[in-house]
């Protein structure tokens, strides 16, 4: 990928992040929930891909996919807990309020030996907080990345580009 292609990818991610962040967090959480459900449906084939590419035994591969599913479940709960504090101010007739603001584009680099779990740790939390993600998977785990991306694309509707693979 040359620098122009990279810049185009980053700009595309910025564009989708602005659209994504405007959704209320519980709605973002619902898409993450659907993603987790799709991972549940694809658990066996995704685990087979991990076994093939990362050379893990089947039980380890199944555990890694389960970790991704568990992160989806965790993020769904978080989507209803992104509240801030309201505090008294030293200034008369004023109050202080703590708010969550998305960062925008978040990067994630994953190694071949944990091709799905590490991505899920980063993506699920970043996404539910209103961010898009650019993912650089290991070149030794491309099929794992493609499997995750296909699962997301299946449930994400207009937000398929929330995950962009470098």
What are these regions (language model features)?
Residues 1-94, 138:
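N-terminal Rossmann-like NAD(P)+-binding subdomain of aldehyde/semialdehyde dehydrogenases
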Residues 84-166:
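Rossmann-like NAD(P) dinucleotide-binding subdomain of oxidoreductase/dehydrogenase enzymes
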């Amino acid at each position: 990928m040359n620098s122009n292609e990279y810049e185009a990818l980053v700009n595309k991610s910025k564009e989708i992040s602005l659209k994504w962040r405007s959704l209320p967090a519980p709605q973002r959480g619902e898409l993450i929930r659907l993603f987790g459900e799709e991972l549940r449906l694809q658990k066996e084939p995704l685990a087979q891909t991990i076994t093939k590419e990362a050379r893990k035994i089947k039980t380890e591969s199944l555990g890694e996919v389960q970790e991704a599913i568990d992160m989806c479940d965790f993020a769904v709960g978080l989507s209803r807990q992104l509240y801030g504090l309201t505090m008294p101010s030293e200034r008369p007739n004023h109050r202080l309020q703590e708010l969550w603001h998305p960062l925008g584009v978040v990067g994630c680099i994953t190694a071949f030996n944990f091709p799905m779990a590490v991505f899920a740790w980063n993506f699920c939390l970043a996404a539910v907080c209103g961010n898009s993600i650019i993912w650089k998977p290991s070149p030794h785990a491309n099929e794992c990345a493609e499997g995750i991306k296909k699962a997301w694309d299946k449930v994400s509707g207009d937000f398929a580009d929330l995950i962009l693979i470098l």
